[in-house]
């Protein structure tokens, strides 16, 4: 008889604790110090980061956070907490939250599950498409947490779910709901968070996952390549990142006759600064200034019922397939 108790740890990237320059600086410092994210020589990168990038970017980014901040706090944290609550209710088992950077820490999430008697932990990084910059960074934090622990709990870590049928179904449903509310646009653009092209050249499978997700979503929606496409946003620095860039794609669509655009970001499980400000506001401005007439931002899956059902299915399959 198996008397082991299973718990679930949902993990996302993280967020500043407040929309202030100080809080944003602290968060960005931790995030951009991770070699999984920026692998530049430390003797070059650290002085550049602390002497130039953080002093300039932190106040600017803080103002952007202020524009999307919710009454309950950071959107990413608010939606992540709702996901935890909904998944816990659906599974009737302990579910905790951890962030790779910032609060709540992955460490505190694991400790919470252990305090509830969990000796088996299923770790679900909320990154549908695997990347060294996201999923692998979660693994690093887990390994760091247990570096000096004599007896490890049983871990199962979800690698990706870019082609999970319920994930694709949830994405398609969110697009259809947008069509019902706002009308159907001429084109659906799937905008994924970008990573340096060099990472993919060195073996990261992120781009392949993004392409497959887009392909499956197109099939689910019954759209042709003339009606749906993909691009990459949030480029940072001068290095070449995955292309096509979202900003350049938006400039090219209207001149091709696409005047009404629906835009979605399948790589984000919860709405955050990159979706609520960059995708919803900045990208809209680019499209409209380039000749577009209608721009519809489709929110992330957040705590949508189908999204929670997908998480529950992933967890349940790991429990009952053992």
Swiss-Prot record:
Organism field: Aliivibrio fischeri (strain ATCC 700601 / ES114)
Pathways per UniProt: Porphyrin-containing compound metabolism; protoheme biosynthesis; protoheme from protoporphyrin-IX: step 1/1
Alphabetical keyword list: Cytoplasm, Heme biosynthesis, Iron, Lyase, Metal-binding, Porphyrin biosynthesis
The keyword Metal-binding is assigned to this record: yes
Any Gene Ontology CC annotation: cytoplasm
Family according to the record: Belongs to the ferrochelatase family.
Listed name of the protein: Ferrochelatase
InterPro entries attached to this UniProt entry: Ferrochelatase (IPR001015), Ferrochelatase_AS (IPR019772), Ferrochelatase_C (IPR033644), Ferrochelatase_N (IPR033659)
Stored Pfam families: Ferrochelatase
Superkingdom of the source species: Bacteria
SUPFAM superfamilies attached to this UniProt entry: Chelatase
Function comment: Catalyzes the ferrous insertion into protoporphyrin IX.
Enzyme class: lyase
Coiled-coil residue spans: none
Binding site for Fe cation: 193, 274
Molecular function as annotated in GO: ferrochelatase activity; metal ion binding
């Amino acid at each position: 008889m198996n008397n082991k108790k299973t718990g679930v740890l949902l993990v996302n990237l993280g967020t500043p604790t407040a929309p202030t320059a100080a809080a944003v600086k602290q968060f960005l410092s931790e995030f951009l110090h991770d070699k999984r994210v920026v692998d530049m020589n430390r003797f070059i990168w650290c002085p550049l980061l602390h002497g130039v990038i953080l002093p300039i970017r932190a106040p600017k980014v803080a103002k952007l956070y202020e524009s999307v901040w919710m009454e309950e706090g950071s959107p990413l944290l608010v939606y992540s907490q709702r996901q935890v609550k909904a998944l816990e209710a659906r599974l009737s088992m302990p579910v905790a939250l951890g962030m790779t950077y910032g609060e709540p820490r992955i460490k505190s999430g694991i400790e919470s599950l252990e305090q509830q008697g969990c000796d088996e932990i299923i770790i679900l990084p909320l990154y549908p498409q695997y990347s060294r910059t996201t999923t692998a960074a979660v693994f690093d934090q887990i390994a760091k947490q247990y570096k000096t622990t004599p007896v490890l709990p049983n871990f199962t870590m979800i690698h990706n779910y870019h082609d999970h049928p319920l994930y694709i179904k949830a994405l398609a449903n969110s697009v259809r709901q947008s069509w019902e509310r706002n009308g159907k646009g001429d084109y659906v653009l799937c905008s994924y968070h970008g990573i340096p092209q060099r990472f993919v050249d060195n073996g990261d499978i992120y781009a392949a996952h993004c392409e497959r997700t887009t392909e499956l979503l197109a099939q689910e929606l019954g759209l042709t390549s003339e009606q749906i496409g993909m691009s990459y946003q949030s480029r940072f620095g001068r290095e070449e990142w995955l292309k096509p860039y979202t900003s350049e794609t938006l400039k090219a669509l209207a001149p091709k006759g696409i005047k009404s655009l629906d835009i979605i970001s399948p790589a984000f499980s919860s709405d955050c600064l990159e979706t609520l400000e960059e995708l919803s506001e900045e990208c809209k401005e680019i499209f409209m200034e380039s000749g577009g007439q209608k721009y519809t931002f489709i929110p992330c899956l957040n705590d949508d019922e189908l999204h929670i059902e997908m998480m529950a299915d992933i967890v349940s399959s790991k429990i009952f397939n053992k």
